[in-house]
Amino acid sequence: MLLVLLAMVACTSNEKTPQATEPVQEKPVQVVDNSPRSLPLLYATDTCKIGQNYYVWELERKACDSLGVVADDMGDKYYDNTIKIVVKKNASTLFARTFKKSDFRHMLDKDFFKNSILDGCRFMKIHEGMVSFSMAVSYPESDMSRPFILNIGPDGSYMILPDDDLDEEYITDSLSS
């Protein structure tokens, strides 16, 4: 009889009492955005008078999804950019062109070309009818860049040259973030 009583006590002590259930808290899911980044659209313009001539220049940098994507060392992806330059002299268009990184291909080594984007542009000066801009092709969000000078002649012709004498004042340029 003692055995039956112990069995009953043992069975009744294992009964679960109803407890208030806590609401299930869902852990926030971190969404990883793997889409390519774009440098911000930038626009700059200015005017100047040299002698009897009035010059107006406009620069516009914008990301272009049709130019391909470049990945940095961390795996972050970036769209390449185009830079549009318009120069007017006495209200007539002297020069208008949209540049892509491929315009600099012959002056970049293969690896740098593959991993860089067209990054910045800045008006430099007008001297003896020549309008000059500094431009840069660089690794995205990096200090690694290749500077260039764009010279636009009085007739609207242009030439791109490597800038071997980069002046520090041109590093933070008009169209660079």
Task: Describe the residue ranges of each PLM region.
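Acidic, glycine-rich flexible loop segments
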Residues: 107-147, 153
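Surface-exposed acidic loop/strand-edge motifs in secreted or periplasmic proteins
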Residues: 29-123
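C-terminal motif of bacterial Sec signal peptides marking the signal peptidase cleavage site
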Residues: 7-10
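Short, low-complexity, disordered segments immediately C-terminal to signal peptides
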Residues: 12-31
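Short, low-complexity, Pro/Ser/Thr/Gly-rich segments in the mature regions of secreted, periplasmic
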Residues: 156-176
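Sec-dependent signal peptide recognition
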Residues: 1-4
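Short hydrophobic/aromatic-rich beta-strand segments that constitute the beta-sheet cores
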Residues: 95-96, 133, 159-162
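Beta-propeller blade signature
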Residues: 81-87, 148-155
